[in-house]
């Protein structure tokens, strides 16, 4: 679980996302409150429930990007889902409870990786011994059943010395490219079972049964020592783990630190002109209520209580408004954050400030072909103006418009990059006007091309 302070979280988000300070502060405080709650005594900790967040803002302003970056910072079970994928229980489509099941799967994988890191040193030693046993097979047992090398003999000393020499070479990487034949555990069978809605539990049990068949079998494989070492370390680490301990820790992690990011929640708002049951809109909202309020979900790893899972919902709300959500769900999302539409100045910052900005990416990509691309301040300003103008005159898709404009701008040089190896290309305002200026002015063309 992340122990970063709200200020540190916001600073980290600022490296990748421009503006939207209110949203950053809200998620930073929510994430820090997870840590604060864990410092309380058990009795009070159970009473402190998370304050769920609803982020409102037009498309392309950073809602989903905040979720992506938050997932990396949280160091806790995190899942991002699209609200539009779900339907009411009993109808064709994914059930809402599958969110918690998927979150638990994420937690189990995360917990297993963390536990494997703790036993990695022992696993590396065991992997080393197995490789050395292949390179220098131990002495065979005699007819009496005792190893012939039990007694201290000069030959045994020589063998131990040789083993240490090979161990040193192995650790220094001198044997990486040598091929050996070694017994490795066979990979689990990948079985996909299709089942009707509502029978997911039976499906997962059948899949586990088929996957466990033959899981103890080994197969001799010939490969380089470098590749074999990686697989052996993972295999030995898995042997050192107790599956029950992994499940127990994962369930605790989900219940206490789990975060669900529910995107496109505005798409499940009920529209006024519809009549009859709305299984993919209001029905989904009703099914979502118990999860957000707190319920118990049965998963293949065990029972999961959702009382302390944090839900962050987001939506553009262009065709609807937050008040179109059913009142009970509105009450479960007490913190409202409105994200602002991006301006031309924001576009300039997006193109220059993030550590992996679009201009940096294009520079690095074309540099692999020997073409050095540089963007002038006037060129970047003009790209931002074109993107902003097209957003204003057609559909406003926010910062995603920069991808479209830049791809169109760089199309020619990207195609002919191999012919211009060793050359330098300066993207200034004139270059931008020449390649996308006219398109941005023609509304009909920009609607289809930009």
From Swiss-Prot:
GO terms for biological process: protein unfolding; proteolysis involved in protein catabolic process. Residues 140-151 have a biased composition (Polar residues). One of its GO terms (cellular component) is HslUV protease complex. The keyword Transport does not apply. It is found in: Cytoplasm. Keywords: ATP-binding, Chaperone, Cytoplasm, Nucleotide-binding. Residues 140-162 are annotated as: Disordered. Its main location: cytoplasm. GO terms for molecular function: ATP binding; ATP hydrolysis activity; peptidase activity; proteasome-activating activity. ATP binds at residues 18, 60-65, 263, 328, 400. InterPro entries: AAA+_ATPase (IPR003593), ATP-dep_Clp_protease_ClpX (IPR050052), ATPase_AAA_core (IPR003959), Clp_ATPase_C (IPR019489), HslU (IPR004491), P-loop_NTPase (IPR027417). The keyword Cytoplasm applies. Belongs to the ClpX chaperone family. HslU subfamily. ATPase subunit of a proteasome-like degradation complex; this subunit has chaperone activity. The binding of ATP and its subsequent hydrolysis by HslU are essential for unfolding of protein substrates subsequently hydrolyzed by HslV. HslU recognizes the N-terminal part of its protein substrates and unfolds these before they are guided to HslV for hydrolysis. A double ring-shaped homohexamer of HslV is capped on each side by a ring-shaped HslU homohexamer. The assembly of the HslU/HslV complex is dependent on binding of ATP. HAMAP family: HslU. This is ATP-dependent protease ATPase subunit HslU. It comes from Idiomarina loihiensis (strain ATCC BAA-735 / DSM 15497 / L2-TR). The lineage of its organism: Bacteria, Pseudomonadati, Pseudomonadota, Gammaproteobacteria, Alteromonadales.
